[in-house]
């Protein structure tokens, strides 16, 4: 079996559910939750005006618990240094293979940043890599099959180099049944962690090296925000900037809320500083990322929304263009359109992931 690296991003298709998930469904008021539910984090919140069920997060968001403390992030930089020192005589080589959406691409750039801080150089050949990271997608069945096929192919590289560390991360890794399948059937995989644990990748990798054991970090968490992670951006023209994580919509066909957690917005000052830095570095096209950017700021509790963020970013001096994705139509506003129309730097395009034009189908899709 040959390893086949992911050449192109997987495109998310409307209504495609991928494989069925395992686990107990949550019920309340005689209603059943949307398909794909395997977490106790959600609950039935009544009905819409058309009697379709409403679903929401069971526990209110606590911003204090979402933000990863600076001292915990500093510890991760210490683990990076420790790993670099452990391999000072022969620096590690790493390969990062990304499946899925632009958010996964942005996550992989942070993974590469952390690996670079550990002293790693990069290769596209898994046979030459000391650390192999597969950042996975749980949206499409085809992408999952590619991941499992590549995991199987990596048994040969592991036999040739028993010291090789194989890591599985991303949305697939957050699913409990996937983690268990890897634990039982892919015993050459050393580290499995979901998107919620991305920020502590250095610590998890250090545990693999020092404790000589397999490490799994797929806790059922609401999600977090970690600022200041290292990043390696590919190219010098386009940059991805995550402005929020997770999703509060429970579309019946979509797994994202269950693997990415609830919506949580980054502080606007952090985003503005990051974009200002990218413009100063010469980046010309900056894409703001979120599962639903139009709901940015709702969890901040300061009366600051996505239109306010775009208006603030537009004030940055320089030659650049701002794009954003994805946009949920129900959360768009005239204020947003007015800001876009008056902006010097926001692209005259609105990304709308249209799923159907039929009200009945849309209701069935929640």
Q: Can you say where each PLM-predicted feature lies in the sequence?
A:
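Proteins enriched for Cys/Gly/acidic motifs involved in redox and nucleic-acid/cofactor modification
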Residues: 48-296, 335, 350
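Short, low-complexity intrinsically disordered segments enriched in A/P/G/S/L with frequent Arg
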Residues: 4, 18-20, 24, 32-35, ...
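Conserved SAM/AdoMet-binding glycine-rich loop
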Residues: 166-168, 175-177, 280-366
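Short, positively charged and aromatic/hydrophobic N-terminal segments
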Residues: 2-3, 11, 41-45, 51
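Ser/Thr/Pro/Gly-rich low-complexity, intrinsically disordered segments
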Residues: 9-12, 17, 23-24, 50
